Amino acid sequence: TDGMKLTLGDETLTLYLTPGHTEGTISTIIPLRDRGQKHVAAAWGGTLFNFGPNRPRIEAYHKSAERFREIAAKAGADVMLSNHTAYDGSKTKLPAVQNRKAGEKNPYVVGADGVKRYLTVVDECAQAALAGLT
């Protein structure tokens, strides 16, 4: 269910339906802690267009990206995660986190502007795909 809360231990995640990538795509707002500091992650569940020139699916993707961008902003998200490691930089960020020294910034913490930018770019990709349809 859209907006469903899922409690895992001491943390509660909020799940949102964000169809587009697939009809059942779910994106999540996740409260986090890193070295005692609180953060909020926006986990975008549907990064890729895997459906060809399908107007209804691309429109759903666009609406979902636009909506989740607003949800992430309201939640104060400052960490951006993707369901594909190539799209959130995890291939380089994971080793950096493992080797991080005291006082070094967590590379996953991109700030509210970084989260907004990521979700704006995926939305703009959907809009460009729509514009390219005949």
What are these regions (language model features)?
Residues G3-L8, T12-K116:
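Metallo-beta-lactamase
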Residues D113-T134:
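C-terminal capping/extension segments of zinc metalloprotease domains
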